[in-house]
A protein has these predicted regions:
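Terminal and linker regions of secretory-pathway proteins
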Residues: 1-344
Length: 344
């Protein structure tokens, strides 16, 4: 169960963060270092802001944070010293559209394509048989499997990965999402220009224009001359994807009784709800309240399933990657009910 982690927590001093800001080109980080430094920052911040110490603490995130949040949460639960246990009033964690383990998240895409009528039943059954339900680590010598996967790729190459119902828009995605999605190169093309007006990711371009504006930088108290052009994603960063799976962290945290809410947009192709269901099922938790709809303003907002030890999985109907971006009202209702310990 990831033994040894709690004995090797390096300290991240203020100089560490200064180096992060001043030397972006040379900064090297990764999954574990990211999680450890977030943990240490949180612990030290609460020590410096003692009025918040007694507040219930929930760690949250979405997308690739699915690889980071469980590590942070377990680090807090372990406690690197007596002081940490006294300071952090940990109650649980929340994750939306979370990347968790490539084997589950990646293999689920083929199933999702078929469920959403993006590929035919015949093609799905052929790939399922020839690839033996393994679509990530495929032997190049298995030519029939490779051929089916190529056909599937051609059928789905121009589907919007973030939300399959929206128009396909080539987007300037960060490197972390390239790793996360593990899908078509065309849809991951890094545009030299900016997204087409009307595409959802056009707001990323607007953010760049806004943050580069001198008056905005002045209002934010950014030191004059330090940022000539704001960059949303630093592609030069040396990032080490050193954690393959965090499934064991979820199991450990559930065993310790921490509350968990895992939710997915059911039209998200980046991290499909089916992939999330797969790793949750691998935990072998007992089902307390089986699959049922949850309602907002008299309408079905999604579906939920409650597992033992306060572990909840929910889908949000019509939402993409990430869920609150597409369904803010429903997402807030879900969060408000869960944080108040009410049924969804």
């Amino acid at each position: 169960m990831d033994k040894g982690f709690k004995y090797n927590l390096p300290r991240c001093s203020c100089w560490y963060w200064i180096l992060l800001i001043k030397d972006r080109q040379g900064f090297k980080t990764g999954d574990m270092k990211h999680a450890i430094c977030c943990y240490n920052f949180l612990r030290k911040w609460l020590q410096s802001h003692k009025k918040f110490i007694s507040n219930p603490l929930y760690i949250t995130g979405d997308s690739y944070s699915g690889m980071i949040v469980p590590i942070i949460t377990q680090a807090i639960s372990d406690g690197s010293d007596i002081e940490a246990k006294r300071v952090l009033n940990l109650k649980g964690y929340l994750l939306g559209n979370p990347f968790t383990y490539a084997k589950f998240d990646g293999n689920s895409k083929i199933i999702y394509y078929n469920r959403m009528a993006l590929i035919s039943d015949e093609l799905y059954e052929s790939a399922k048989s020839k690839c033996k339900q393994e679509y990530i680590d495929v032997e190049i010598s298995n030519r029939m499997c490779v051929k089916d996967l190529q056909t599937i790729s051609e059928c789905t190459a121009h589907i919007n990965t973030m939300r399959i119902l929206e128009p396909y828009c080539p987007s300037e995605l960060p490197n972390v999402r390239k790793y996360l999605l593990g899908t078509h190169e065309d849809s991951l093309h890094l545009s030299d220009g900016y997204p087409q007006f009307g595409c959802r990711n056009y707001y990323c371009y607007l953010c760049k224009v806004w943050a580069t504006d001198i008056s905005v930088q002045k209002a934010l108290h950014i030191r004059k001359g330090t940022i000539k052009e704001w960059v949303r994603c630093n592609k030069s960063m040396d990032y080490d994807y050193d954690v393959a799976s965090v499934v064991s962290y979820h199991l450990c945290l559930n065993t310790r009784g921490y509350r968990a809410l895992i939710y997915s947009g059911d039209h998200d192709l980046a991290v499909t709800y089916g992939g999330t269901e797969s790793w949750i099922k691998s935990l072998n938790l007992s089902i307390v309240d089986d699959w049922r709809p949850w309602i907002v303003d008299g309408q079905v907002a999604g579906y939920s399933r409650e597992y033992g030890n306060n572990f909840t999985f929910a889908t949000v109907k019509g939402a993409g990657h990430t869920t609150p971006e597409y369904k803010p009202k429903e997402s807030f209702s879900m969060f408000k009910r869960w944080i108040s310990q009410q049924p969804l």
